[in-house]
């Protein structure tokens, strides 16, 4: 989810950048202005910082960035992934993994160590609110892009 969500952030930056900087001449085929733009270039957009969008500084987007970067650059958010079992009367009731600890959207860190699970938050309990908030912000972002560009002519 986190890698795909981050890719969506990249794509939205490209779309917003193209719409904010439209092609003025179609006499030749030119490279898209957004071809080199990625999520890190969002600060160049007029929409950057817009409330309730993916461009607003918020914990959910920071968590997506942090977990995507951790997975891409370090392979996982836990060095030795563990699945925990809850057993009652010799029957497995639940299987779960723990979600890493965060401080203001960033992985909790102590002296270059980032893999802490002291909060005991289960992945399934954390993933649903992150997913819902991300898509709510994404929808608001797209609505703002459409509304802004409908008025630009």
Give residue spans per PLM region.
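Extended HEAT/HEAT-like alpha-solenoid repeat tracts in very large eukaryotic scaffold/adaptor proteins
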Residues: 1-5
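Alpha-helical repeat scaffolds in large eukaryotic proteins
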Residues: 6-13
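Acidic, Ser/Thr/Gly/Pro-rich intrinsically disordered interaction regions
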Residues: 14-153
